[in-house]
From Swiss-Prot:
One of its GO terms (molecular function) is structural constituent of ribosome. Signal peptide: none annotated. Belongs to the universal ribosomal protein uS3 family. PROSITE patterns: KH_TYPE_2, RIBOSOMAL_S3. Part of the 30S ribosomal subunit. Forms a tight complex with proteins S10 and S14. This is Small ribosomal subunit protein uS3. GO terms for cellular component: cytosolic small ribosomal subunit. Gene3D superfamilies: 3.30.300.20, Ribosomal protein S3, C-terminal domain.
Amino acid sequence: MGQKGCPIGFRTGVTKKWRSLWYGNKQEFGKFLIEDVKIREHLRKKPSCQGAAGFVVRRMSGKIEVTIQTARPGLVIGKKGAEVDLLKEELRKLTGKEVWVEIAEIKRPELNAKLVADNIARQIERRVSFRRAMKKAMQSVMEAGAIGVKIQVSGRLAGAEIARSEWYKNGRVPLHTLRADIDYATASAETTYGIIGVKVWINLGEKTSTANASAGSAVSTAQ
């Protein structure tokens, strides 16, 4: 059933790292989970975080560390770190705890599914042909070194009366193979005809069990 499930959740702990790194007992777990959701929702609404691909939340001795993964770190940091300081203060008021904000730069945005999906969605909002946007994105992904890529758009494409889905695929995207490092993300474009959904799958290659073990140990010792 690899075709039906989320590729990220399907591979978490195998080739994908957890996006929330903390432990909570029965009394704390629900509270921590709600805090994580509020933090992510707040960051997604910030203009400085519009180009962010993801957020990792860590907790340690009453403090929260949020790592923002972005291809444009300068936009998140702001002039002389003003934006980061503002984020820290807003998150401190939101959670009532001390919050650290770290910035992780994405070196190759063409291989990040979230950034690719957001780029396609923004082009569709600017009335660029969805087929042109999809084909251009696929070309950039493959030229960046991906093994395979699949892109799907759904909705009232080009203003059609009946909603439909169209997809393009290039290379190999084995969703059933757990050792395959598949990056997956969704985005939505708000058009005058309604919402257009965008899904992107990118095959970054295969990871061996040894690589997985070292990746897991790196997470536990990082920062």
